[in-house]
């Protein structure tokens, strides 16, 4: 049973999402509707994109805590370009390139300069946030064109154009990681760095690619954020990095690298977002969201740690079972007495 749970974390995450959707339905039948699903998905798109990028980094046994700042910085660039008169396609391409460049810089610090990922990205977290505030002067960016907001308007089956793009990206990345040698290189790099090098995997390049794509996903999340609310506050992206990491852990992405699936991270992001809608239904103040999400994450981490320890004990027991000789059987004393009498 323990091995099944460990090997099928996506199934357990899916069950948690389904239960969190069904149980509130007993309190309000209107909650069980397609409209609720589309609403939750629309709210979850930013976190899903960030979780997809964080998955690539975590698979290589690294972590990036600067994605919130990258999201904010890229959203600010998008707003500035649009207000300066540039077209939406040009502004979006420039925004994605900035995110790619920011992620590439993180990757260079980690892979080439050998700076621990948590230290490097803590530094760039402040750097990118500072650039964002320098560009805006601490002010909000408003007056964005209506065509930007159309990106998040319902297009087909209640899902926006960006929503469908997110679905396509999830499917493509799931296929890439599961079915291609390039995708498996991320797992190999995080599972055994030296072993991956001996197999010919360019581990430094893989880690740089992981950070670069993570930055690109953060930039896309910034575009989604701006299109959904129509303006850009000076604190855009604050705290999103922790939610992205939490979504990955909830979905079964190992902090030790080398295991997990993109679908699990998406389900984790959906679960964290769905908590908001349940709190609204239960009329619980919104500031409870972080507390409940943190409590759930802590419970998952404790459970994951205990599960890993139990599996390791079981594997050791199976490994050394053939070396353990059974204790010698003790013959009954009565049989010995009968032989002496004979």
UniProtKB/Swiss-Prot annotation:
GO biological process: autoinducer AI-2 transmembrane transport; quorum sensing
Induction: In the absence of AI-2, repressed by LsrR. Induced by AI-2, via release of the LsrR repressor. In the absence of glucose, induced by cAMP-CRP by direct binding to the upstream region of the lsr promoter.
Location of the protein in the cell: Cell inner membrane
Record-level GO cellular component terms: ATP-binding cassette (ABC) transporter complex, substrate-binding subunit-containing; membrane; plasma membrane
Oligomeric form and interacting partners: The complex is composed of two ATP-binding proteins (LsrA), two transmembrane proteins (LsrC and LsrD) and a solute-binding protein (LsrB).
Protein's organism: Escherichia coli (strain K12)
Record topological domains on the Periplasmic side: 1-13, 60-69, 114, 178-212, 273-283
Lineage of the species this protein comes from: Bacteria, Pseudomonadati, Pseudomonadota, Gammaproteobacteria, Enterobacterales
Membrane spanning stretches: 14-34, 39-59, 70-90, 93-113, 115-135, 157-177, 213-233, 252-272, 284-304
Record function comment: Part of the ABC transporter complex LsrABCD involved in autoinducer 2 (AI-2) import. Probably responsible for the translocation of the substrate across the membrane.
Keywords: Cell inner membrane, Cell membrane, Membrane, Transmembrane, Transmembrane helix, Transport
Family statement drawn from the similarity comment of this UniProt entry: Belongs to the binding-protein-dependent transport system permease family. AraH/RbsC subfamily.
Annotated NCBIfam families: PRK15432.1 (NF011961)
Descriptive protein name: Autoinducer 2 import system permease protein LsrC
Gene responsible for this protein: lsrC
Cytoplasmic side: 35-38, 91-92, 136-156, 234-251, 305-342
InterPro entries hit by this protein: ABC_transp_permease
Cystine crosslinks: none
Alphabetized GO MF terms: transmembrane transporter activity
Topology of the protein relative to the lipid bilayer: Multi-pass membrane protein
